């Protein structure tokens, strides 16, 4: 695997020098300063590429080119936003950058309720608490019909939890959910959030799939033409939330994408932390079935709790994700490609790490502190080395 590291650009609290010392050779980044939907010019792409290469690294993967909400709702100026996206792909290819991670999650990107969940060893992790989320949705956001998405027990627990929250607890929970986490391109006030949710009131799973198909049928031929590999990131968490449909959550969703546009440019990001939240997702089987189309991996781990819809970011090698079998399947896919004469390694980043050690005393981006990701990268690197030596060094 190609070892990579997500970097949020010149304002990132983790420097490119830090990235190189961590042992990564590739950088995963995006032009976050360009408004959603606008074309990334060749000039701006080359500026960022030069910064990365001057640090002795390569720009391996774009994560992400945001998809304008008009495209997802099939309203407004969606045709122009699609044309802009096509041009950005052409410009990236012209600059030699050919792997693009993206997602099709409506309104929100990845979602957590607690950004400072304290683990038994004193380090901090990200957490999604189903009951806190229900309390937010029913008692703070007050979304009409929200109760239909929860069990009677969850509704009662959410009311009890809300009753114990201070004003600061409520404000913090609201910020965590709607203010935008690292990598998210949108943050909202409560009123703005309600208005954005309203745009989806008539969009169910079938309609969102229809809108996604329009996007794929416009984008994938361009990607194929210029040699760019599109790698869709799964929903996080991988299930409907806030009354919003989710359409990249299961192996059936992956198959639907392939059936909709059967091009090798139409591929996947294997995010084990996102897919792994669902107990019915067999990660190794997913890799084996869709291995030739996996162009990027996020190797992180999650642990489901007593309520199976509650989870936290766990240690990379101690979670519901069998990291050994996952890495083995990825390495096997790389060797399959090599046997076909392809030399491309699959870029991997350790994704979210725990806030730990000296980083506990620093300001950090939630999930993206340096030391926790350094630990995760080193652990995954060790697993891969052991697998390579044991099975492929003959």
Swiss-Prot record:
The keyword RNA-binding does not apply. The keyword Manganese applies. The gene is uxuA. This is Mannonate dehydratase. One of its GO terms (molecular function) is mannonate dehydratase activity. It comes from Shigella boydii serotype 18 (strain CDC 3083-94 / BS512). Catalyzes the dehydration of D-mannonate. It catalyses: D-mannonate = 2-dehydro-3-deoxy-D-gluconate + H2O. Belongs to the mannonate dehydratase family. It is an enzyme of class 4 (lyase). InterPro entries: Man_deHydtase (IPR004628), Xyl_isomerase-like_sf (IPR036237). One of its GO terms (biological process) is D-glucuronate catabolic process. Its cofactor is Fe(2+); Mn(2+). It comes from the Bacteria. Its EC number is 4.2.1.8. Keywords: Iron, Lyase, Manganese. Signal peptide: none annotated. Coiled coil: none annotated. Pathway: Carbohydrate metabolism; pentose and glucuronate interconversion.
